[in-house]
């Protein structure tokens, strides 16, 4: 704040006369720069010229410095970049990083900082790979002297009021040092990013949190060096398949991490991120268990020791460069075996809380201080892809960061809802520069500038929503000794936020605002709010009606719920332009191309409300059309079929003829009855000695057959899953899994250990190895397999007439799309868990005639 006041006073001191910008000015863009910087400054110069045109009606030409010659030099100029400032003698020798200046001298204006490209040899990097203090100076100039406000990305995101005069005080020297130098966030547009302090990693190289897969990619090393990868359940495991496990005690892993970091530093980065992968499985080899000594009794402590060693080696090889070590997941707890870090280390604290930052700053020596990685937004926190953060939470977070000297903020998942969360985004960015700014005044400014004559009803709209979000933020209370009071189910939270009363009030406000908007920009912003609100309001309705159905699952309660779900399907169709492809992306928002609706998430993610904690299975993934056609009440009925008998052993290969002709195919749907994304089906036969299963499924390409062996992690690969319960019980059943490799299979049984003192009592016994066979082949895009299960293996005789068993078949598939993900199919659906393919309570019934 002191820097901003100083700059303002310096300008005010010369306010008796001023440089008045008119049509004779030109904007001069430096030509001799790295291409990334050059392109960014050209774009910024054009946007500045456009703002002068829209706000003041001025036609200001943008020219390259190489073309600025002859008669042009007699006209006044707005110079961009450090070169012209140095020639004019207005560049301070100590200006560095994102520090920038606005200077008036002799009628000319200089907007500048020392712009650099993070990787100088990269031919044409995007703006986020550059340090562009000149762009920050341009946004500040537009805010200060044109009264522009950056409310969102792109032209629609700018509010540019009309003015009759643009003037800068003579001798103005406005110097500004942003409080952060590390600001990764979704890069919607450059000027918005700089205005909102979401300008990218700057001079630091960020992997987005995870380094290991870059240092030791499985496609490069696993075949020749499986010893680099974690030993899990007796098997070396490649990185992407099983939660990115590496053998950290192997000295080569430390070397590979070092090589990766040094390579990025040698490319030009001032600092580089070091962080482990996601995942909860770690190498179980004896050397890893002993790594770090007896005091290193957790995986996190071992990782801290490894990461410190890597940083020490970097310090020797590349003095002056920085290693940014992430404190995340296993390393969320600071190290206990040491308190001081090498001279080249800064720490990136994930999930920063008051208690965590206080502990770090008071008890540890970290020479380059702290940056934070925040999870305020994204598709994974509750309540999902609807508005999440209150004004209160934004203000508390930013002010806390300032108290603890945090100099960087990684905004994970930021920017998916520029309509309903617009004021919160604006507030967060503004408070970074001015943490003590009045929150109500900033929110009011947003509403005034975004909605014009519709500001009053829209302030009421946003405040009504904010009061619900504030209560949710207060319930979360991460530092409370009693833990969070927030609902653990996103449906419960959605039902609380969008009650009928709240939703009706918000809608009434929005209707009033839509009738008051005047300009096209205002109408476009309101259209975005409308789309996001209609989506959220429908979710609130679904949540309330689903609660009613669960209390009383009848046709009367199912009908309105089904109506709301069909309404939701229409909303999704509108968002995705009629594209029902699960991996389809939404088109750009009409009239606002910089907006990626709902964070540009694939349809499958929005269908489930988001990822991780935000995921909702039932009822959002129900196939309502199918349910209505079959008169089905979800959770109140089970799939069932009769199993034909045979005296002959059926053949493997021809599932249409021979004995298999006696039975029809049973189709697997999505795990919650939704339309399947992969085709899979099965048949059953009851022989005199064995129970037979024929299963086949489409596979778009040849599967990767690593082979898990007997009782290996079959579920990590393409597989079928079968549950057999002769007693039709959730406590007594057998489970079988098999892969494309017929030797790769798993089995276990539940309920057969009756001693309560046995460690395996109450859980599935995977040490049981039953006698059963699998035949399997992959050919022409089709995986076909046959299982023969002797009755004696499951302690049964050939079932007599009228006998019924609990039974289910599932399929785990890998999507072949660019963003690969797992697909879960099931014969008898699981309406409670979108991943509960092995849930024994979700079983159908097979009858033996």
Where in the sequence are the language-model features?
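Acidic, contiguous N-terminal accessory segments
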Residues: 11, 17-99, 164-172
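Feature activates predominantly on carbohydrate-active enzymes
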Residues: 43-47, 51-53, 95-308, 315-319, ...
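Aromatic- and acid-rich polysaccharide-binding/catalytic face
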Residues: 337-354
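Catalytic domains of carbohydrate-active enzymes that cleave complex glycans
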Residues: 431-637
């Amino acid at each position: 704040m002191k820097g901003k006041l100083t700059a303002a006073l310096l300008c005010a001191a010369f306010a008796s006369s001023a440089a008045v910008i008119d049509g004779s000015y030109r904007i001069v863009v430096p030509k001799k720069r790295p291409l990334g910087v050059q392109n960014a400054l050209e774009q910024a110069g054009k946007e500045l010229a456009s703002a002068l045109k829209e706000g003041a009606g001025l036609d200001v030409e943008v020219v390259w410095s190489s073309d600025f010659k002859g008669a042009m030099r007699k006209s006044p100029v707005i110079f961009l970049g450090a070169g012209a400032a140095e020639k004019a003698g207005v560049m301070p020798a100590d200006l560095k990083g994102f520090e920038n200046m606005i200077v008036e001298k002799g009628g000319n204006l200089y907007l500048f900082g020392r712009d650099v490209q993070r990787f100088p040899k990269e031919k044409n990097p995007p703006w986020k790979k550059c340090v562009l203090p000149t762009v920050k100076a341009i946004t500040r100039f537009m805010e200060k002297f044109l009264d522009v406000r950056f409310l969102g990305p792109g032209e629609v995101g700018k509010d540019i009021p009309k003015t009759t005069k643009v003037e800068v005080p003579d001798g103005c020297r406005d110097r500004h040092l942003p409080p952060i130098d590390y600001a990764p966030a979704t890069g919607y547009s450059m000027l918005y990013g700089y205005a909102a302090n979401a300008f990218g990693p700057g001079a630091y190289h960020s992997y987005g949190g995870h380094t290991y897969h870059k240092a030791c990619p499985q496609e490069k090393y696993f075949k020749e060096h499986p010893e680099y990868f974690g030993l899990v359940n007796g098997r070396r495991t490649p990185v992407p398949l099983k939660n990115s496990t590496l053998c950290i005690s192997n000295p080569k892993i430390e070397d590979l991490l070092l090589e990766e970091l040094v390579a990025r530093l040698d490319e030009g980065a001032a600092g580089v991120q070091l962080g482990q992968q996601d995942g909860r499985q770690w190498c179980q080899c004896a050397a890893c268990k002993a790594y770090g000594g007896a005091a290193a009794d957790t995986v996190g402590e071992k990782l801290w020791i490894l990461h410190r060693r890597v940083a020490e080696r970097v310090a020797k090889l590349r003095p002056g460069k920085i290693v940014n070590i992430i404190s995340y997941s296993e390393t969320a707890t600071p190290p206990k075996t040491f308190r001081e870090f090498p001279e080249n280390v800064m720490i990136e604290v994930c999930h920063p809380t008051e208690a965590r930052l206080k502990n770090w700053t008071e008890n540890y020596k970290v020479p380059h201080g702290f940056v934070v990685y925040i999870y305020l937004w994204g598709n994974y926190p509750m309540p999902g892809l609807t508005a999440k953060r209150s004004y209160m939470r934004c203000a508390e977070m930013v002010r806390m960061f300032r108290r603890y000297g945090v100099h960087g903020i990684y905004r994970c998942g930021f920017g998916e809802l520029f309509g309903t969360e617009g004021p919160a985004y604006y507030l967060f960015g503004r408070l970074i520069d001015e943490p003590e700014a009045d929150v109500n005044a900033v929110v009011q400014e947003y509403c005034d500038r975004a909605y014009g004559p519709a500001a009053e009803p829209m302030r009421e709209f946003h405040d009504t929503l904010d009061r619900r979000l504030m209560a949710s933020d207060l319930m979360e209370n991460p530092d409370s000794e009693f833990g969070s009071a927030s609902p653990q189910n996103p449906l419960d939270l959605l039902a609380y936020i969008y009650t009928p009363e709240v939703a009706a009030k918000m809608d009434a406000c929005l209707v009033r605002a839509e009738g008051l908007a005047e300009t096209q920009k205002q109408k476009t912003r309101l259209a975005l709010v409308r789309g996001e609100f209609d989506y959220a309001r429908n979710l609130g309705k679904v949540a309330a009606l689903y609660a009613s159905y669960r209390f009383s699952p009848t046709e009367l309660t199912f009908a309105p719920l089904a109506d709301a779900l069909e309404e939701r399907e229409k909303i999704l169709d509108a968002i995705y332009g009629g594209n029902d492809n699960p991996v389809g992306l939404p088109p750009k928002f009409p009239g606002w191309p910089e907006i990626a609706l709902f964070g540009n998430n694939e349809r499958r993610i929005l269908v489930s409300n988001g990822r991780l904690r935000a995921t909702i299975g039932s009822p959002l993934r129900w196939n309502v059309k199918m349910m209505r056609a079959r008169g089905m009440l979800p959770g109140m009925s089970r799939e069932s079929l009769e199993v034909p008998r045979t005296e002959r052993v059926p053949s493997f290969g021809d599932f249409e003829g021979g004995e298999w002709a006696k039975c029809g195919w049973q189709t697997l749907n999505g795990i919650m009855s939704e339309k399947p994304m992969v085709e899979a089906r099965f048949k059953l036969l009851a022989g005199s000695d064995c129970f037979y299963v024929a299963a086949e499924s489409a596979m778009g390409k040849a599967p990767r057959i690593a082979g898990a062996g007997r009782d290996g992690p079959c579920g990590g690969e393409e597989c079928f899953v079968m549950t057999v319960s002769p007693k039709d019980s959730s406590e007594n059943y057998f489970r079988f899994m098999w892969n494309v490799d017929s030797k790769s299979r798993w089995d276990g049984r539940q309920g057969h250990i009756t001693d309560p003192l046995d460690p395996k009592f109450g859980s599935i016994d995977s040490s049981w190895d039953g006698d059963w066979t699998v035949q399997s082949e992959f050919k022409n895009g089709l995986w076909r397999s046959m299982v023969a299960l002797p009755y004696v293996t499951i302690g049964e005789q050939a079932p007599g007439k009228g006998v019924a068993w609990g039974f289910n078949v599932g399929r785990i598939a890998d999507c072949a799309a660019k963003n690969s993900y797992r697909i879960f199919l099931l014969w008898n659906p699981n309406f409670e868990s979108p991943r509960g393919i092995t849930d024994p309570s979700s079983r159908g019934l097979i009858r033996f005639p």
